[in-house]
């Protein structure tokens, strides 16, 4: 049995009309992950619905409602092999009302491909594109490549490609802390497959890698196995004859049968009996594994989604308050002391109150612009002190980055995103 290729999780981000789903569909098809017969069937279906050209995107848009609307809603996971990796695609939704999915989706990615429409050079960078790139950066994705798509609509013009590339570098990438010189840009036409898996003869002026080769050039993630165990709970099931089975993804550390564990902020203590993934028992599970596990001594009513599992010797931190660096993405008015929106951190959703606005920063450089500002508005970056209204596990990004990041939502939109830089633990 040949050793399995390492898995690389790649998020596809960008504006809804940039052709992300088509790009992903093309990678899956040319990568041999889709039966070509399926594409023929979907093509017919797309033509009947008056959406010819959407057939690749149909592959990702599994849900019927999504097919009708032509919008990707839930985060879809699909796999295809490249020369080096088994790539799992995290296709992140583009529409603003699905940004929450984007936040939970992007945090599972090792690298991101930003898909942009070459035509945006004329209309300017879409706000959604900015938000996705910024969120990816905040969520800790340090590897990024850019696919400049729909090159067929500008006759594969090198000038248009260069204009878009420069605009992205100057007006977006530098601002959020990516160095454009270290980022690979690829001119693609996903609908026809140009430079996706196969080199295109229509871009003789481009001698860089294809999109599949760019993915192969990403570095594999280092699993944070040496950090303390942290496993945010997604769901809790009660299975007859087995008992309580919490489900979640190991973020850091290692979990195995026999471990003495604690759920915080619930405070429930138990012992791991079994660990399972895809209905198979495991001797242990490590970061990235989505598992179900059986715990002795803990009932279904004792724990819930948003609790975090750790070892009793190093329990998760329940925050009395925390200091965070945030960036305000959008807000109809201003944020002031006393503002209490909902924080989405790991699997928890808890309202937190702004206790202090300590510093306003330059979002591009991090330098302090103002001490103790009176308010924050869209586009501002800041250091703030926050207090959860209910018990919440939060870790400092310096210690356990996977549990230090969050998004702030209000009025049905993501108003800000950030990370905890210092956490004051609650006294028991």
Swiss-Prot record:
GO terms for cellular component: cytoplasm. It comes from the Archaea. CDD domains: EF1_alpha, EF1_alpha_II, EF1_alpha_III. Keywords: Cytoplasm, Elongation factor, GTP-binding, Hydrolase, Magnesium, Metal-binding, Nucleotide-binding, Protein biosynthesis. Residues 149-152 are annotated as: G4. GTP binds at residues 14-21, 91-95, 149-152. SUPFAM superfamilies: EF-Tu/eEF-1alpha/eIF2-gamma C-terminal domain, P-loop containing nucleoside triphosphate hydrolases, Translation proteins. Pfam families: GTP-eEF1A_C, GTP_EFTU, GTP_EFTU_D2, GTP_EFTU_D4. Residues 70-74 are annotated as: G2. Coiled coil: none annotated. Residues 5-225 form the tr-type G domain. PROSITE patterns: G_TR_1, G_TR_2. Its main location: cytoplasm. It is found in: Cytoplasm. One of its GO terms (molecular function) is translation elongation factor activity. Residues 189-191 are annotated as: G5. It is an enzyme of class 3 (hydrolase). It catalyses: GTP + H2O = GDP + phosphate + H(+). Residues 91-94 are annotated as: G3. Belongs to the TRAFAC class translation factor GTPase superfamily. Classic translation factor GTPase family. EF-Tu/EF-1A subfamily. GTP hydrolase that promotes the GTP-dependent binding of aminoacyl-tRNA to the A-site of ribosomes during protein biosynthesis. This is Elongation factor 1-alpha. It comes from Methanococcus maripaludis (strain C5 / ATCC BAA-1333). The gene is tuf.
